[in-house]
From Swiss-Prot:
Classification via SUPFAM superfamilies: BRCT domain
Quaternary structure annotation from Swiss-Prot or TrEMBL: Interacts with CDC27 and maybe other components of the APC/C complex. Interacts with histone variant H2AX under DNA damage conditions.
Modified residues (Phosphoserine): S279, S287, S296, S333, S548
PANTHER family: MICROCEPHALIN (PTHR14625:SF3)
Record protein name field: Microcephalin
GO terms under cellular component: centrosome; cytoplasm
Database matches in PROSITE patterns: BRCT
Domain notes: BRCT domain 1 is required to prevent abnormal chromosome condensation. It binds directly to the SWI-SNF chromatin remodeling complex.
Post-translational modification Phosphothreonine, affected residues: T335
Region (Disordered): 332-376, 417-442, 555-583
Amino acid sequence: MAAPILKDVVAYVEVWSSNGTENYSKTFTTQLVEMGAKVSKTFNKQVTHVIFKDGYQSTWDKAQKRGVKLVSVLWVEKCRTAGAHIDESLFPAANTNEHLPSLIKKKRKCMQPKDFNFKTPENDKRFQKKFEKMAKELQRQKTNLDDDVPILLFESNGSLIYTPTIEINSSHHSAMEKRLQEMKEKRENLSPTSSQMIQQSHDNPSNSLCEAPLNISRDTLCSDECFAGGLHSSFDDLCGNSGCGNQERKLEGSINDIKSDVCISSLVLKANNIHSSPSFTHLDKSSPQKFLSNLSKEEINLQRNIAGKIVTPDQKQAAGVSQETFEEKYRLSPTLSSTKGHLLIHSRPRSSSVKRKRVSHGSHSPPKEKCKRKRSIRRSIMPRLQLCRSEGRLQHVAGPALEALSCGESSYDDYFSPDNLKERNSENLPPESQLPSSPAQFSCRSLSKKERTSIFEMSDFSCVGKKTRTVDITNFTAKTISSPQKTGNGEGRATSSCVTSAPEEALRCCGQAGKEDACPEGNGFSYTIEDPALPKGHDDDLTPLEGSLEEMKEAVDLKSTQNKGTTSKISNSSEGEAQSEHEPCFIVDCNMETSTEEKENLPGGYSGSVKNRPTRHDVLDDSCDGFKDLIKPHEELKKSGRGKKPTRTLVMTSMPSEKQNVVIQVVDKLKGFSIAPDVCETTTHVLSGKPLRTLNVLLGIARGCWVLSYDWVLWSLELGHWISEEPFELSHHFPAAPLCRSECHLSAGPYRGTLFADQPVMFVSPASSPPVAKLCELVHLCGGRVSQVPRQASIVIGPYSGKKKATVKYLSEKWVLDSITQHKVCASENYLLSQ
């Protein structure tokens, strides 16, 4: 640490870039602290110095009003280099906005990331106030105990008991004291997350009231008042869990719109009841049947009636308009979908659906929405995977019930709680790992308007207006499920135009953007979804979907097609029809030549010419036009870039890291340069923190670069643009620098010095220091000639262990370095090496 030369200084630093987007205060704060000054985070009465540059006008006015010394960043640097307290009047701060009208408010938005500091009562005032307020409230409650009012409590078995107030208050205060003590020790946040609240409810026996079954009759559930009251008192008032209360109030609002659905209310209450029960994960086989006892007979018949009808595209388009409004109105999508009795449950946990944006499933969705739909469809398979693992077999009626229960349980949990860890891990599984999940089966008999709306809410509308392959649910079920369901001859078959099985549902989204995407690596197969040229007669054919890996390998492997660049021949896995009739050809015949670099930068491995024409998202044809349109925006972005990269480079040498950080920030702000580690052909400026003769300085001299001090950067930062270099050139320490720079400026072509042009051929020893390559480069840049073998040279530079000749001069490396520094050939007699 430097000497405390500024020990009496209390500084307030406000250093911004001229456009107000970059804050450079931290670097100068560090330098001031190293010199012994105190740096205040706020402008208080103890501040004696304000380091100011492009700061707030209010700071400037306050400093002038109080008579505080306003200095520039140059004062800090001068004090550091001189090692003494420099007079502040030599470096006054400048306020460029002083003469601007006061009505103009300059907005400042720092684009630099903030440092994360863990909040404690010591470093956070709001946290400290909250902590003190909580302690005062505890003290007030201790002094104002009312011992006269008894308390009535409900035990977990439903019995009513009498408890004196003293016991309740004492236990309550002891819990608060314990909580405060833990907070003091751990310094944790005062507001626990909902996952912490859930853990407390399991550990604390006083919260066991949540586990009490809500024995409310079915008739009572029909009224909204009883539903809201029972739900509120059980979860919000008794438990004191504000998180649960918020969820119930949301549910209460949604139930007001569906008064006629008795089963929905019962399902909600049962899901809430099971939510607090720790034994839910160990459900026996009889629980789904008991759960379904509340379903009406019509809805159970609706589950069992699996008809062969399909929902037409017109119905999908009509429902696509009202689908997003329906989801917005009824937030209870997991429960609603389960009460309708359909086996195509497209549900997610409530906590997950809140954090992930809903996407509309219309066929006119832009590409961004299609990418979101791809992720959401894969996530929707998760409940079915958990169901298959827990039960081990598929039950015809109990499937929706179990899924509804699992969704009901997780809909009130915190998304980041440990209970949902398994769920979130399962979302990342590739599609083929989810094949054992139960296939989505559906009934499409004549439905009412409300039932159709419920189905449309859960359906995928991405394939409206497209002809897709059909799936034999029976064959697929027989291969993936150990105990398949019993279906009739005509009932087991259904087209997948509306809803497909779980694996295909995850894979169908690959074709949404008008092209095929290869499946994850290692699968060895890919699905072909869209058939734009499929003949009309294939609409009614039911093609079995074979799930074996060997048959899937017959489909196109798109990744190998892209890498090899050969024509892909895709065969239909069931009918063996030719590619030219059904599938778009991905390999294009392009007349325009493209370089290897352009091909590598094209998206997805495609290459081709680019034409001016609109991008098409609906169909692919056999020409390369579709891919040209996809490639075009990427190439335009590549050509335009985010501003062209500067052609000249700047090199730093003999500079500590803190100075380097300042230089990098200033260069990034003022533009015009790019930072290079070593001097090269494009280098024009060499910044030297100390006047030391380094290789970069010598190379900069030999190439005719500016050799400047660090102050040039500081003054440029002060004035907001790159200023003239001449006052900051280190010509006193390196007299050759301005001479070589002038020669370089006057030279017509590429500059090459003439210092060693009259010298004989030289040989640089491999044992020389600096390294051979750098020393040879220096000699070559100064006009010298370097030989690779010593017998052709008349001058040998560096230590030489071979046989020495009398006619050859053996000189030290310093001869080359001193000659370049002084810009004259030094006398060789002073640099001879001992024979």
